């Protein structure tokens, strides 16, 4: 895989306050410079773009440390062609669209806490934590969460990345969650990306997934960074073009 050179941290982003630093397992960080008003989101190619990440422990660096989570990896060393970024990582360990995480939260809480009118992009990733929930209850919850994100940030682009698989033959319930998330993402006007169909983690499970069979290794987090960053930048460019 070809890697694009990356800027130094000090020339691109800086850490800003976390949504709740007191949460031990929250994995909730915001990184980037202060952003200008959202009144002119495409006014300048140098305008800071605010990205909100909604997700679970696959986005927090669980098992390796927050610094290794793919959102922090992008923020710490963005590609040379990336605009100035403020990445607000609201992901919570154990959370899902319907599943309540270790801090008592779901994706709905993350949207409420992190998505503001200033957001340029809201990225959803997951969630494998929803596999045991009844699809009949899960699907309307997914739809409501996307609607809430739209309401809180009408100008933002929505990018939805479905749950990954850890086998070339994923179980039926995983595919069912993927399918309903895709349906609701497209209904909400979001772009949907399918890690199962693209084989994100099954490319090399021994390298990318830790001994628990679920969470990324350090190398796996870098692999997710390499998958997510082009999607993020493409979505930001598309949003800027539409706004312009």
What do these predicted ranges mean?
Residues 2-14, 29-31, 226-244:
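Conserved catalytic region of serine esterases and O-acyltransferases that act on ester linkages
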Residues 24-27:
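C-terminal motif of bacterial Sec signal peptides marking the signal peptidase cleavage site
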Residues 29-93, 112-113:
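Serine-esterase "nucleophile elbow" of acetyl-processing enzymes
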Residues 50-55, 59, 86-91, 120-126, ...:
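Structural recognition of the beta-strand scaffold that forms the well-ordered cores
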Residues 63, 88-106, 213:
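Acidic/histidine-rich helix-loop elements
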Residues 104-139:
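Oxyanion-hole/transition-state-stabilizing segment in secreted/luminal serine hydrolases
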Residues 125-129, 148-179:
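Active-site segments of SGNH/GDSL-like serine hydrolases
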Residues 167-244:
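Catalytic His-Asp segment of secreted/periplasmic serine-dependent ester chemistry enzymes
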């Amino acid at each position: 895989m070809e890697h694009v050179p990356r800027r130094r941290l000090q020339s691109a982003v800086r850490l800003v306050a976390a949504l709740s630093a007191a949460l031990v397992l929250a994995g909730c960080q915001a990184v980037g410079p202060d952003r200008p008003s959202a009144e002119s989101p495409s006014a300048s190619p140098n305008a800071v773009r605010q990205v909100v990440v909604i997700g679970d422990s696959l986005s927090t660096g669980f098992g390796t440390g927050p610094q290794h989570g793919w959102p922090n990896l992008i923020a710490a060393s963005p590609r040379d062609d990336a605009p100035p970024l403020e990445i607000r990582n609201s992901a919570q360990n154990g959370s899902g669209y319907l599943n309540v995480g270790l801090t008592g939260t779901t994706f709905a809480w993350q949207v409420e806490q992190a998505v503001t009118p200033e957001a340029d992009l809201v990225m959803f990733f997951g969630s494998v934590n929803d596999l045991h929930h009844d699809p009949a209850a899960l699907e309307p919850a997914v739809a409501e969460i996307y609607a809430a994100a739209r309401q809180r940030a009408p100008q933002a682009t929505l990018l939805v990345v479905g749950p990954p698989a850890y086998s070339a033959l994923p179980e039926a319930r995983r595919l069912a969650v993927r399918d309903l998330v895709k349906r609701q993402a497209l209904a909400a006007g979001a772009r949907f990306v399918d890690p199962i169909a693209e084989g994100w983690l099954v490319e090399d499970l021994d390298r990318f997934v830790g001994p628990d069979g679920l969470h990324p290794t350090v190398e796996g987090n870098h692999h997710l960074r390499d998958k997510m960053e082009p999607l993020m930048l493409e979505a930001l460019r598309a949003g800027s073009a539409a706004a312009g």
